[in-house]
Amino acid sequence: PMHARLVKGAYWDYEIKNSQVFGHEGYSVFTKKAHTDISYLACAEKMLSIKNLLPKFATHNAHTIAAIHQMGGQANFEYQRLYGMGELLYKSAESVLGKNNKTTIYAPIGKYKDLLPYLVRRLLENGANSSFINRLLDPETDSLWLAESPVKKIAEESKEIPMPVNIFNDRLNSKGLDLSEQANLDKLKDCLKNFDGKTKRAESVYDSRNPGNSEKHISKSLSNGTDIGSVYFDSCESIEKAFSYYKKSSWTKTSVVYRAEVLKKIADFIENNPNELLYYLIHEAGKHIEDAVDEIREAVDFLRYYSDEAIKLQSTSNKLNGPTGEENILTYHPRGRFLCISPWNFPVAILIGQISAALATGNDVISKPSEHTPILASIITNIFHSQGVPEGALQLVLGDGMNGATLTKSKSLKGVAFTGSTDTARKIQSSLLDNHKEIVKFIAETGGLNCMIVDSSALLEQVTDDVIRSAFNSAGQRCSALRVLIVQEDVYQDVIDMVAGAMEVLDIGPTENFNNDIGPIISKDAFSKLKDYIEVASIDGKNVIQPHDYINNIYIPPTIIEIESLSELESEQFGPILHIMKFKAGNIQGVVEEINKLNYGLTLGVHTRVESRADEIARTANVGNVYINRDIVGAVVGVQPFGGEGLSGTGCKAGGPNYLSQFVNEQVVSKNIVAFGGNTELLNLQNKE
């Protein structure tokens, strides 16, 4: 007969977390253990009825053992238990049920370093509070509860586990799409086909604009090279003239509650109508479909989160403690006009994050997106205007870096929010100092030489998955992407072999093909710089591992470059290039000190199963975000506020509780109550006595 083993499965907690992280409609697994127990018995019943099949039932649950014994009758089957567990349980079962069916022991075989994580995982699962073994050994557990049929426990889903959309108490989680379901992918492909062959017209939106001063550009798909739109860039002279004066829009006079309602309306619209943005994320920005879906979710989260945070900040005044007879009130007011300069690598999420923060707090906004993604910026601006944001409150300027430089000189600015390179941030800071009498607020989020430290206790399979995602998702074109993998020498070669092996199976090509993993570099200039860097490294004698070839002067294959020291790195390489170096056991703090000397401080990854070691690294590393035993990309709004220090940025973290404070001025009104006729509060106290 054919042998078939039935198990209840593992990593249930991972599946629950995964559905919450990706905003799925529901869960791919049961949320109540009783549902799993019933399904197990249903499968067991089916297996027992099949001829020429020898079922092997792996379980440590006495009720399941008894139920299968009852269902099995004279059928030929086996029980299985895990090596080192369940011995007393099965001895008890034999004494009650007899020795009609044999019990085999499932004993995994392998090297110690591979087996230990597996065995620990099994012990943790079987030792969980909900497990039968744990309840059996608990003297306070009622024996009737242990014997109760799981059928009586399945009336409803677990109330302890909220649906993915409701995991945040004070706001909705953005809806995602389960891309592991082929039906979802097929439906999405059909929807996106509706935009093929259509072209968009993208142009600036601001008062007194003269279309005659614009230069036309044809935008082509990064995925297939077809025309996707006509884009009009205005001259620096016309921009300088248009923004030489400023009149506040009606938006600045609205209540924070009204503004929040409008922004949440925009969030709902984008969440329910994502396909056009998805299409141009793929074709204009070269995004993989998974990254595109994640980006739209992040934009929706920004809109909802900043709406709620603005209400907390501005809806009520704050009465401060002080001496009797005096009233001190703190309030927050809009700064004025903000210039928001957003990048091409997150043309939806970061653009919407910047402008929604400024708008939520009552400011007027000039949006200056990257010259590489003007169509997406135009679509977003139109959505904001159609859903209730006045054109005077949100103006759009399309153009290259010179147009952005011109805008930074505008005397009407009260603040600038920027995401991009460190060099550009320095230029903006210098321009603000040179061209403004007052000190203009500058919020900058820049790049980083992001590292990941891996010690010998790490689970290398998980390390490999997290390295691939961190270094090569979005073709490495994220400011949070992994640039340097620092591995303890004891496992160094194993890590390189596993990561290089994983790189080999990555598919490179147009992102309109959902089967591809790595998409294009944003421009041919960027491609040339990355290719030159790799070639120079090879000429200099560094070991370069590159399983794939360059394609069409736009696709850089995932690349490993081995280095000896962090001092060999001078700046960030914005693409799928991963540097790898080793360190000696016992020198982790020395590694952290070397990382701190880089003066970048954005993200840091740590892979270790020694919790005290991870905590010590997090305490001593000068970085904004530390990720332990996971990838280092994909920060979630309100959950992992994102931003760095040093060369990696200024100010408070985006998507965090302090971010909006940068968009407001504080005012304190101190009132001497005695001067208005006496301190009635104090006098009333005297009367009570």
Protein language model features and the residues they cover:
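Short, structured beta/alpha segment
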Residues: N129, N134-H283, Y305, I554, ...
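Conserved C-terminal structural/oligomerization subdomain of aldehyde/semialdehyde dehydrogenase
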Residues: L54, Q74-Y79, V120-P139, S143, ...
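Generic beta-strand/beta-sheet core signal
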Residues: R5-V7, K56-H60, Q80-L82, Y106-P108, ...
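ALDH superfamily catalytic-core signature
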Residues: S386-G388, G415, D423-E564, G586-Q589, ...
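N-terminal Rossmann NAD(P)-binding subdomain characteristic of aldehyde/semialdehyde dehydrogenases
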Residues: W251, V257, E261-L351, I355, ...
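Rossmann-like NAD(P) dinucleotide-binding subdomain of oxidoreductase/dehydrogenase enzymes
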Residues: I282, K312-T464, N515, G651
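Structural signal for hydrophobic packing residues in well-ordered secondary-structure cores
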Residues: G127, K247-S250, A267-P274, L278, ...
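Positively charged, amphipathic and often flexible ligand-engagement surfaces
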Residues: P1-K175
